[in-house]
């Protein structure tokens, strides 16, 4: 057979192979140019190697002129399993070249080099809980845009009908909260609290009435939601971020003061917490605030306070509950006049130089700064000036048990936006920094770190 006839036969065989709907084996037709159907596939194409990957010798011996390091078997396996993500990951994408365009763009050039690693590492940030073991202040994962609401939408709700839910898993959604708390009553809306779009492990749920709020707190505070123990509290509006009010507070002027009337309740059963105390005295009128004093172990001391807006409600409470028996304990209810700056349902204690309570607060916050070593004490700055002590407990007890929390005031009694918080254990302090550092509270990004005394 002449060279011309042999060349014609080779061309016919090549055309026949390319037109055939059945893929031929690579081991067939020794001596001919390699079938490049793999390189022509979308996603596996590399123009710079299109013609360089031909055989120099026997196809069976796998002798390449293009210098490819993988066997024919692996090339065939990559082609046959091109739609299997696990199979794709077995092969190093770097061998495809920098001009390979994947499903979401160039896989090597779209991301900075610092994000690429020679070894795969597990991302624990989506697991919720304590988050990853990386640097402090790590956020949860980004919440899907369609699941997140704007800040204005989140704060524009009826706070008296809302609850605050803490210690959520990072994969929880507003729909999960709605489904879970619908067992209590009709849910108007549910939101996940975020910081710059990142899940912070906290949320809010709004009901149609305040009775559902009380039931939700009694039934689900300390319950398990998505395999995590959650905290459920009465939701409070963020402290006012009004500039005029801030300036008034800077000058020591207290505007819109609303006088409340307080009763002291003694000999309470240990089973009565602040929510139960509030429920009891709500029968006498509009309760502004209720609290039960706890000892160092978090156990009730049997003493509590209830504040009313109307003096008539106070007299009604004394008349009804003084000498009243609860679980065998006879209550002792007396009046104690107290003036509070009350804004939107939250008590703000007025600092007074001769107050022994504020003297203790000064001693607790005196010479305390941030940037300390790991310990139970937390230093928080950049708080809204209208933040109350009760706000501190509402915020920081979403993480764990708080032994003490105090606001710092300047020499004139004006707020400084600084607070010192002591947790019961150092693990809660760790989580507090991780979850609440840079958290937007009342329009202010909080700066939280371990505290130290000078």
Curated annotation (Swiss-Prot):
Residues 14-24 have a biased composition (Basic residues). It comes from the Eukaryota. Its main location: cytoplasm. The modification Phosphoserine is found at residues 338, 343, 355. Coiled coil: none annotated. GO terms for cellular component: cytoplasm; cytoplasmic stress granule; nucleus; P-body; ribonucleoprotein complex. PROSITE patterns: RRM. Residues 1-141 are annotated as: Disordered. The keyword Ion transport does not apply. Methylated by HMT1. This is Serine/arginine (SR)-type shuttling mRNA binding protein HRB1. Present with 1990 molecules/cell in log phase SD medium. The modification Omega-N-methylarginine is found at residue 127. GO terms for biological process: nuclear mRNA surveillance; poly(A)+ mRNA export from nucleus. Binds to intron-containing transcripts and is involved in quality control for the export of spliced mRNAs from the nucleus. Binds to pre-mRNAs until splicing is completed or until faulty mRNAs are degraded. On correctly spliced mRNAs, GBP2 and HRB1 recruit MEX67 to allow nuclear export. On faulty mRNAs, GBP2 and HRB1 associate with the TRAMP complex that guides those pre-mRNAs to the exosome for degradation. It comes from Saccharomyces cerevisiae (strain ATCC 204508 / S288c). Residues 25-38, 50-113 have a biased composition (Basic and acidic residues). Keywords: Cytoplasm, Methylation, Nucleus, Phosphoprotein, Repeat, RNA-binding. It is found in: Cytoplasm; Nucleus; Cytoplasm, P-body; Cytoplasm, Stress granule. InterPro entries: Nucleotide-bd_a/b_plait_sf, RBD_domain_sf, RRM_dom, RRT5_SRSF_SR. Disruption phenotype: Sensitive to boron and hydrogen peroxide. Decreases cell population growth. Residues 161-237, 261-338, 376-453 form the RRM domain.
């Amino acid at each position: 057979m002449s060279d011309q006839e042999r060349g014609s036969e080779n061309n016919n065989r090549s055309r026949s192979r390319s037109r055939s709907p059945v893929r031929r084996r690579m081991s067939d037709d020794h001596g001919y140019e390699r079938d490049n159907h793999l390189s022509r596939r979308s996603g596996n194409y590399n123009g710079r190697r299109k013609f360089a990957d031909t055989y120099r010798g026997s196809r069976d011996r796998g002798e390449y002129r293009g210098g490819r390091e993988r066997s024919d078997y692996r090339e065939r396996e990559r082609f046959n399993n091109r739609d299997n993500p696990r199979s794709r990951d077995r092969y190093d994408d770097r061998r495809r070249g920098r001009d390979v365009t994947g499903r979401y763009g160039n896989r090597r050039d779209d991301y900075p080099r610092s994000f690429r690693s020679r070894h795969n590492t597990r991302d624990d940030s989506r697991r919720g809980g304590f988050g990853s073991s990386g640097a402090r202040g790590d956020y949860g994962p980004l919440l899907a845009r369609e699941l997140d609401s704007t800040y204005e939408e989140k704060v524009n709700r009826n706070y008296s009908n809302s609850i605050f839910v803490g210690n959520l898993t990072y994969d929880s959604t507003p729909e999960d909260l709605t489904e879970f708390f619908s067992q209590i009553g009709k849910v108007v809306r549910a939101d996940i609290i975020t910081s710059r779009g990142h899940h912070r492990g906290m949320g809010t749920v709004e009901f149609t009435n305040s009775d559902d709020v009380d039931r939700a707190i009694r039934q689900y505070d300390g319950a398990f939601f998505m395999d995590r123990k959650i905290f459920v509290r009465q939701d409070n509006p963020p402290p006012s971020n009004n500039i005029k009010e801030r300036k008034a507070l800077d000058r020591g002027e207290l505007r819109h003061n609303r006088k409340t009337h307080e009763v002291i309740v003694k000999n309470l059963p240990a089973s009565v917490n602040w929510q139960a105390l509030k429920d009891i005295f709500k029968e006498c009128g509009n309760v502004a605030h209720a609290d039960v004093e706890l000892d160092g172990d978090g156990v009730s001391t049997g003493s509590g306070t209830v504040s009313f807006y109307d003096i008539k409600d106070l007299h009604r409470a004394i008349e009804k509950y003084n000498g009243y028996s609860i679980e065998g304990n006879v209550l002792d209810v007396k009046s104690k006049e107290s003036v509070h700056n009350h804004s939107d349902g939250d008590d703000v204690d007025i600092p007074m130089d001769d107050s022994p309570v504020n003297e203790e607060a000064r001693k607790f916050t005196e010479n305390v700064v941030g940037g300390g070593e790991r310990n139970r004490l937390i230093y928080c700055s950049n708080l809204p000036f209208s933040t109350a002590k009760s706000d501190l407990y509402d915020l920081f007890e979403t993480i764990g048990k708080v032994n003490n929390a105090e606001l710092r005031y300047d020499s004139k009694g004006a707020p400084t936006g600084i607070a010192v918080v002591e947790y019961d254990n150092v693990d809660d302090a760790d989580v507090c920094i991780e979850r609440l550092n840079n958290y937007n509270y009342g329009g202010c990004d909080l700066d939280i770190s371990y505290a130290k005394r000078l």
